[in-house]
Amino acid sequence: MLASAFGCAVSQKTVVKPSQAPAPLQTATKEQLLDAYNRQARAIQSLNAGVTLKLTAGSAYSGVIEQYHEVNGFILAARPASIRVIGQAPVVSKNVFDMVSNGSTFSIYIPSKNKFIVGPANLERRAEKPIENLRPQHLVDAVFWPVITEATPVLLEEGSEGASRFYILTVVRSEVPQPTTGSSDAASTTADQQRSSQHSTPKWEIARKIWFDRADLRVSRIENFASGGKVASDVAYSNWQTTAATSYPWQINITRPSDDYQLQIAVKKLTVNEPIAPDRFSLPQPAGTDLVNLGENIGDSGHKDSGPNNKEQHP
């Protein structure tokens, strides 16, 4: 009966207008895609951008989705890992946050909370509120791409999402040995690693997946993976525009599943590859603010500290 029901259905044909027809698919080899990616990665050494920032904290998995207001802001970044991000309230242009990272440590100043937060850049302590998981170095991974060396294993596949077609480069790396649980000293851990290294077949894991839209062969998405196959970040790139003899995406959407937030960055003004003074990445603790050191034990994480006077700096 089900077959007859489908057989009795009226067949309809939809004529696609020329303007709605999908763009012809472009073709490329793995070597050509790697070359295009590396040229783009090397092309951007610094950037100074006026942006709008829109943060969504929470996900369907957490059960709570909280949409934050869109704020204006600035992003300063310089290789290898220096970044400063300032968010400002609309109309009054008053800072709502100011954060910096040099790749080793980060600092965040939140005027409304009178808090100055510091910690190591590789901190993986998840906060109860997703918005507190936002770190300046998360943006470094999105705005600066690491170059893929010739010795790095890379796989190529084709993929699709809806009507879009993609080339996907999968970058793999040797699995990072983890210390043996319960090892009481460094000697036992070292011995375990030595025994593991004696295996003739290396253990591999995915480092990144780079998506190229076959409509124009531009990078449209980069997935970065942590150990164990967990997605650390999923970054979408669109609205590519020519800037100073190179091109750059003016829309960057960052999703970090483990940190439970999404950040949409819309570029309004952009300058690339111009020198940025080192003091632009300096953020001293304002006087009278509460210092929260996330690198310390929770019991010692907050205390009153009167830092030197510091006027807010704007890029």
Give each language-model segment a name.
Residues 80-138:
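An acidic-aromatic
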Residues 8-70, 298-315:
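N-terminal leader/targeting segments and the immediate start of mature chains
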Residues 64-71, 95-101, 202-204, 229-234:
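Amphipathic hydrophobic-ligand
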Residues 3-7:
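C-terminal motif of bacterial Sec signal peptides marking the signal peptidase cleavage site
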